[in-house]
Structure formats: C-alpha cells, structure tokens
A protein has these predicted regions:
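Sec-dependent N-terminal signal peptides
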Residues: 3-14
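Beta-propeller-forming repeat regions
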Residues: 18-434
Length: 434
C-alpha cells in the first residue's frame, strides 16, 4: 500500500477571542494513489479509541492510517500501457491512468444503523443505482455484510439528514423524477427503505446537480432545496406535494450540496450553494424576509466566481462539486469546506480541468461592515470529489478533512498552534481589493 505523510505548508490563521490567536497547518496523509471513490468519511471502526478513515472499499486504521482493511470487494482493475507493455492497476481509471473513468462509489458516510454501537458505512453508489450500508462486523475478519436499502438514488449530491426531527437520518435524494427523501424502518434498518415523494414529477434525473435541505422559513421544519427554489415542509406529512417557492439559485446546471444557514447572524436562514459543479461560482443567498405572497426574497452574494477580481482575495477555481458546512476554527460559526473536483469529466472537458486541484476552507467572518468569507488554502494537489467531509478524525477538538477522488484517498489532520497577534496578522490571507 502506498502511503505518504507530509506537513502541508499552507497556513490558516484564526482568532477565537481577543487574546487567542492560532496558526493552522494541515498534516497531509495520501492514503492511496488509486481511484476508488469520490468521497470518504471517518469513524472509530475498531473501537480502539483512534479515529479511522474510510474511502472506497478500504478503511485505514488511525492514528497513523498505515494499516488498511477491506470492507467490500476490491477486485476492480483496469489496464494501462507502460513502456510498451500492459500493466494492470487496481481501482478505476483516474490520474494514474491519464484518462478519465468513474467509480462505483459516489459518496460515503458513517452511522450506527443497527444500534450495536459499532459505526457502519453508508455508500451512495453510481447515480441512479443502489444505496447500500455495510454492517460493521465488530472486528471479525472478512468483508462486511451489505444491506441494499434503495435501488434508484438519483442526483449527484445525496446525503443523510434528519428530515422529521426523530433524531435519526433519512436519505436526501430524488427518484423517478420526484424530489424527496428515503425513510427507513429503524426496527428493521436492513430492509428496503421507502421513498417519500414531496414534489410533482419534474425533469430531475440521476445526474441532476444541486440538492440540499434546511429550515428556510424558520418554522422548525426541514425544507428541501434545489436549484429551482425550495419546497416547504408542511406541518402534517399527509402525502401531498410540498409547496414550491421558486427561486433561481442557479441559472445553469446547478452545483453540489446546498445548505440553509444563518450566514449573517440576523436570525433567519440564508442559502449556500455553488452555481455550477463543472464551472464557476460559490455564493450565498441572503434571506431578505417574507413577502406579501408568503414566499421569501433572496439576494445573491458572490464568494468566488469566474474572475479573480470577483473575490476580494483574488481566488478562483472551477468544478465546485462538493461542499461541507462545518466549523473549522472552533469559533461557533459554520465555515465552507470545498475545492476543485479533480477531472470531473477527465483531462479534456469542463473549465480548467488541469488547473491545480485545490482544497479550501472559507472562514465565515461577521463584522460591523457586513459578512465576508476569508479563503484559506489547505492543499493544492488533492481537491475534492463529489463529496468532501469535515470531521474530527483524531478527537483533538479540531476539524479534519477526508477526500476521495481521482487522485486517490486523503486525510488532512489539522494542527492548531497558538501564536502572537503580530504573527497571526502577518500570516492572515491578504485582501487584494476592499
């Protein structure tokens, strides 16, 4: 197994209080150079007190991630020509093949599905195909038992989220041209889950971009977001379609995971999204309040876009195909974790496919002059897949990052070092325009 560890020299700086200043570096673990999945996650799978990382068919045992374990079949291979001879490589065509390919694992999450206190692994496979959870065998040898719970999970940004406030996750996805989510029977979580339709039939299909959820109108219920607007969850779930509030959250194909979050701290939730998962644009839509018709007005704010001049820090990159909303610096505000999906459609398609595969976190900052996001570069040779996960892998209280994509599998461990205000100011990202 190939494993590389290095300290990433990209520096993030943040202050938690007037007297606390931190410089943040990232310990980069290149767990595997082979392409197995477009996402990954973390949990303590062997319950030894150390967080582990899962990407594709493998989980890597913490704290050093050197020992690899297989949870489902890793027999997929492909051929390349090297020095005039054919060579067989594990996984799927990606960076090592110098040609494009796709995996059978689009997103990965962890959760204890059967309540035995051992974390299991949830895999959204190829869009439109099976969603499966793999049952942790409690340190017993062999592949993990698999449970296929839904056959046609459409969309490129599904994820688990508690839709009905019962403390357990539903699976946010769409199917058969309808928006909705999938609900399980927690007395029998390995049996097929049921799709809960919330919209009339539309043009949504397996490769639709941009999908999310959150409480948009502040009524305490989780609404559903798509690039065409948001669907209001009613007080009673009676099987009828949810009310659609049209908002153009993307003029193009749509982006990645979408979130409702109070960005500006004014008490109502705004919307965070990318504009095009294969193009440009990371934005937040300010919730301007309720209209006479009962809907809400939104104002778009650009974080980064097509031109460096559209960012106060001169940052731009393409293919924002994965977003996580997580508190990176421990200040209580949720930051944006994202980056460039490496070779979404290979080396010859999309915008700037061969530009550096960057991984960033955007620090949410509220000031008397308003809200802005400060970009902090984590790495410039990894990027994201269709998923990026911010999770405290090693339990030190700092958010770490897991990536799976066509460059392989990565874990980034955050290192926060207390410093002086002068050093903090010197290291802080500099604005190129006011």
């Amino acid at each position: 197994m190939h494993l590389r560890i290095l300290i990433v020299i990209c520096i993030s700086v943040s202050s938690l209080t007037a007297n606390d200043y931190f410089i943040r570096t990232w310990e980069k673990h290149h767990l595997n150079p082979h392409f197995w999945a477009e996402g990954g996650h973390a949990a303590d799978f062997n319950r030894d007190g150390h967080g582990d990382v899962v990407v594709g068919p493998y989980w890597y045992a913490g704290p050093n991630f050197k020992k690899r374990h297989t949870l489902y079949s890793d027999k997929d291979t492909f051929e390349i020509k090297k020095a005039g001879k054919k060579e067989k490589l594990p996984g799927f065509p990606g960076e090592l093949s110098r040609r494009n390919g796709y995996s059978n694992n689009f997103l990965t999450y962890t959760y204890d599905f059967n309540g035995d206190e051992w974390p299991d692994v949830l895999v959204f496979g190829w869009p439109g195909k099976n969603t499966t959870w793999y049952e942790n065998p409690q340190n017993k040898p062999g592949l993990w038992p698999e449970h296929h719970i839904f056959q046609t999970s459409n969309g490129e940004s599904p994820r688990p989220i508690d839709m009905n406030s019962d403390g357990k996750p539903e699976l946010l996805l769409h199917s058969g041209g309808h928006l909705g989510y999938v609900q399980g029977d927690w007395n029998a979580p390995s049996k097929p889950w049921k799709f809960i339709r919330i919209s009339a039939k539309g043009s949504w299909q397996r490769y639709t971009h941009g999908y999310g959820a959150g409480d948009v109108n502040g009524d305490g219920r989780v609404d559903i977001l798509a690039k065409e607007g948001w669907w209001e969850q009613p007080a009673e779930l009676d099987g009828k379609d949810w009310k659609h509030h049209p908002v153009q959250f993307s003029k193009g194909r749509g982006g990645a995971q979408m979130y409702a979050y109070d960005v500006d701290g004014d008490g109502d939730n705004d919307v965070i999204t990318s504009l095009d998962g294969h193009g440009y644009g990371l934005v937040w839509f300010e919730n301007l309040g309720k209209t006479e018709s009962g809907s809400f007005n939104f104002k778009q704010h650009i974080i980064i876009n097509r031109e460096p001049s559209e960012s106060p820090y001169g940052v731009k990159f393409t293919q924002i195909h994965a977003i996580d909303l997580v508190d990176i610096n421990g200040d209580g505000l949720l930051d944006i974790l994202t980056g460039k999906r490496f070779w979404a459609h290979g080396p010859g398609k999309d915008f700037e496919p061969s530009a550096p595969a960057v991984l960033y976190w955007f620090e949410l900052t509220r000031t008397p002059k308003g809200v802005h996001y400060i970009p902090h570069l984590i790495d410039d040779n990894s990027g994201v897949g269709t998923q990026v996960a911010g999770v405290d892998i090693n339990g030190d209280g700092h958010t770490d990052v897991v990536v799976g994509n066509k460059k392989g599998a990565f874990a980034f461990i955050q290192k926060a070092k207390k410093t002086t205000k002068a050093q903090w100011q010197l290291a802080r990202p500099k604005r190129v325009k006011n």
